[in-house]
Amino acid sequence: MKKLFGISLITVITLFFTFSNYSIVLAGDSPHFVGVKTCGMCHKKDAKGNQLKVWKGSKHAKAYKTLQTAEADKIAKDKGFKTKAVETPECLSCHTVASNVDASLKGKKFKIEDGVQCEACHGAGSKYKKKSIMKDHAKAVAAGLTDFKDKATIQKKCETCHNKKSPSYKKFDFKKMWKEIAHNIPKK
Ligand code: HEC
Ligand code: HEC
Ligand code: HEC
Ligand code: HEC
């Protein structure tokens, strides 16, 4: 009996260390949000479609500022919120990226004020932002880049925000809306 107890105690201790190690690895392994400044460093060449410039000229870049207006505060109030629009989690959830994510998952250059920036659609970038990974689609996707394999996948992503939960919802015409923000790399 004594011997048996000794063995099971060792088993328990072994299991504990095995699993506690796993959870440490998992928690430290999630990609974090690096912010548009980081993506923009490499994606601002005109010959490659200057994604940074296209985004800066889009309403997505102003989505946070929109929440700082009197119009936004009125919308929030009419919906029964007691806080200013820019302090209301529901509004922030569509007008920014990672508003409800732990600070440890946001890099130094990440700014909530940047509104609906690159990682809103492409996914948190700390693990795929390296040039060698970015150039290899499969590696980038494995490192967290959203895989936009067809139009339906893209439209689904848009509709996570462009839907009836938006207080100012306008019917979402995907073709027209994508044209307004398209930032493809020009084909040679
Ligand atoms: C160190 C430079 C660098 C950084 C930083 C970087 N990229 Fe890239 N990215 C590239 C290169 C190089 C390519 C390959 C295409 C090309 O030559 O422009 C690429 C390709 C892409 C593609 C197309 C990949 C595919 O397989 O479909 C997307 C989308 C993209 N980047 C988004 C981002 C986002 C979002 C960020 C920020 C989180 C980012 N990139 C940060 C250099 C970079
Ligand atoms: C994270 C949420 C989010 C996602 C995902 C998103 N959008 Fe938006 N989009 C917004 C918000 C918020 C606004 C309004 C910004 C403002 O006016 O301040 C907006 C505005 C726009 C506008 C300007 C509309 C106008 O009235 O002028 C276009 C075009 C647009 N989005 C296209 C797209 C497309 C296409 C996709 C998918 C590829 C997409 N969006 C994905 C949140 C999102
Ligand atoms: C489900 C996502 C979502 C939520 C939640 C959301 N918005 Fe928006 N917001 C959008 C999108 C997308 C647009 C672009 C217009 C549309 O809905 O088609 C937008 C546009 C706006 C505009 C610009 C008005 C216009 O006509 O273009 C204001 C102001 C605004 N939102 C305020 C708010 C406030 C305040 C809240 C919180 C009470 C809020 N939004 C919550 C997605 C959202
Ligand atoms: C509203 C969503 C959204 C935002 C914001 C956004 N993108 Fe994209 N991006 C897409 C989608 C969807 C595609 C895929 C288009 C396709 O396959 O036709 C794409 C494609 C790309 C590509 C590859 C283009 C190609 O032709 O292969 C690059 C590079 C890229 N985005 C970089 C960026 C960068 C950098 C930012 C921020 C400055 C950004 N994107 C912001 C949705 C977005």
Where do the protein language model's features map onto the residues?
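Bacterial N-terminal signal peptides
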Residues: 8-21
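Sequence context of c-type cytochrome heme-c attachment sites
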Residues: 22-113, 119, 125-152, 172-188
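Functional cores that coordinate and move charged inorganic groups
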Residues: 120, 165-166
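Alpha-helical multi-pass transmembrane bundles of energy-transducing inner-membrane proteins
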Residues: 154, 158-161
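Positively charged n-region of N-terminal signal peptides that target proteins for export
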Residues: 1-7
